[in-house]
Each structure stands twice: as structure tokens, then as C-alpha cells.
Curated annotation (Swiss-Prot):
GO annotation terms (biological process): respiratory electron transport chain; sodium ion transport
Source superkingdom: Bacteria
GO CC annotations, alphabetized: Gram-negative-bacterium-type cell wall; plasma membrane
Name of the protein in its database record: Na(+)-translocating NADH-quinone reductase subunit E
Function (record text): NQR complex catalyzes the reduction of ubiquinone-1 to ubiquinol by two successive reactions, coupled with the transport of Na(+) ions from the cytoplasm to the periplasm. NqrA to NqrE are probably involved in the second step, the conversion of ubisemiquinone to ubiquinol.
Family under the similarity heading: Belongs to the NqrDE/RnfAE family.
Location, primary (coarse class): membrane
EC top class, as a word: translocase
């Protein structure tokens, strides 16, 4: 339940997969609004990236607990056997969003108290983290892949770090583009989308590499043999003598 068939090496594979190979921004293009709006300065992009990574990691872990102990069909059986047939999965999406919004509000209060400059730099985009589709998408991806708890935490952290990496790289490029001779009709949004597309193509070169599969589980053919009914042995070395 907590680690499943995943080893520590598999956890590293999940992190690298979520960060580079299946980057949540450059492979699924989730969270593009704040990515484009808050990447004009590297310091602002770095602060927003750290915030998204933190929110995604914490809310991914909390929402895993919500899924497996509250909303999953039969999840309430730990309270009472009489509740085993209750299915609250229709509330799952709403509860996920509530958890994300609540933690985002906590983060906003902390930044306002301890990092006033970053709080003012992010502006309206800080509370909009609550509806950042990259965070909800990362949570849903982890839930639908049926990760145990620790792999879910690592996947959420990797997805958040991948989004952070993408916006920091993009902000670095945009600062260079400010001093470049960009054609007039491509300035602004045009060159931003072209740059993002080129970054996505670079990360797409890692497509096909899968290093996140568990390696401690039994091979499928062993389980099949164990579950199949025994077959008669037609190649026995000793045969019954035929009746004369």
C-alpha cells in the first residue's frame, strides 16, 4: 500500500520520468497560462516554480489519502464494514480541488508574511495556483496510475520539479530574447510559443524511455502458471503397460 512492488531504484526512475521524460508542461502543456505570464523575469519564474512544486507535492500526497481512505469505492470500510458498499468517487474531483485551494491559501499567507517581494511579484497568479491545471493534472495522473503512497509522493515531486524546470528554462531564454533581434510579427506571444515548441521537441527526444516500472514484482508468466489449472502430463517417461 505504501511502497508496493516499487524499489528505491524504481522511485528514482519515477522521479526522472516525471521530471524529464514525461514533463507535465512540455509533454501535456498543462499550466500554460501562468507559465507564459510569469516567465518574463527569472526571479519571478523561479519563485512560482518552487511554489507549484511545493503545492503539487503536498496536495498530491494528501489527495492520495483522500482517494484511498474516503472517495475510492469501498474506501470507508476501515470505519465500519457497513460502509464497505458506499462509493463517493463522484465527489473526488471536487475534494481534490478543495484540498489544492486550501493549501494554496496557506501558501499565500506564508509568502505574504515571510517573502513579501515574491508575493507582490506573483500578484494574481499566486491564488490562481489553486486552479492551475498542472497541479490537478499531476494528482489525477498519479491516481489513475494506481501508484502506492511513496511512489505517488515521488511522482508529484517529479511533476512539480518538471514544471519548475520548464518555466525556469523558458524565463532564461526570454531574458535573452529581450536583447535579440526578433522579427516584429513574432514578438511577444509568437516567439514565446515557438520557443516552447522547440523546448518540447528537445524533451521529446527522451520519449520511449520507461524507467519507472516496478522490478520487484513477479513475472507475469509465473503468476499465470500459478493460477492456471494443472494440465495432464503427456510426456511422462514411464507409461502404464498396455493390456495384452
Amino acid at each position: 500500500m505504501w511502497l508496493g512492488d516499487y524499489s528505491l531504484l524504481n522511485l528514482l526512475g519515477i522521479f526522472l520520468q516525471a521530471t524529464f521524460i514525461q514533463n507535465i508542461l512540455l509533454s501535456t502543456f498543462l499550466g500554460m497560462c501562468s507559465y507564459l505570464a510569469c516567465s518574463s523575469r527569472l526571479s519571478t519564474a523561479n519563485g512560482l516554480g518552487m511554489s507549484v512544486a511545493l503545492v503539487l507535492t503536498i496536495t498530491g500526497s494528501i489527495n492520495w489519502l483522500v482517494h484511498y481512505f474516503i472517495t475510492k469505492p469501498g474506501a470507508l470500510a476501515w470505519l465500519s464494514p457497513a460502509l464497505a458498499n458506499i462509493d463517493l468517487s463522484f465527489l473526488e474531483l471536487i475534494m481534490f480541488i478543495v484540498v489544492i485551494a486550501a493549501f494554496t491559501q496557506i501558501l499565500e499567507l506564508l509568502l505574504e508574511r515571510f517573502s513579501r517581494n515574491l508575493y507582490l511579484a506573483l500578484g494574481i497568479f499566486l491564488p490562481l495556483i489553486a486552479v492551475n491545471c498542472a497541479i490537478l493534472g499531476g494528482v489525477l495522473f498519479g491516481i489513475t496510475r494506481n501508484y502506492p503512497f511513496l511512489p505517488m509522493v515521488v511522482f508529484s515531486l517529479g511533476s512539480g520539479c518538471g514544471w519548475w524546470l520548464a518555466i525556469v528554462l523558458f524565463a532564461t531564454i526570454r531574458e535573452k530574447l529581450a536583447y535579440s533581434d526578433v522579427p516584429q510579427h513574432l514578438r511577444g506571444t509568437g516567439i514565446s510559443f515557438i520557443t516552447t515548441g522547440l523546448m518540447a521537441m528537445a524533451f521529446m527526444g527522451l520519449t520511449g524511455i520507461d524507467i519507472s516500472k516496478p522490478t520487484t514484482s513477479k513475472p507475469a508468466f509465473v503468476m499465470n502458471i500459478a493460477t492456471d489449472s494443472p494440465q495432464p502430463n503427456t510426456h511422462s517417461s514411464s507409461e502404464e503397460p498396455k493390456a495384452s
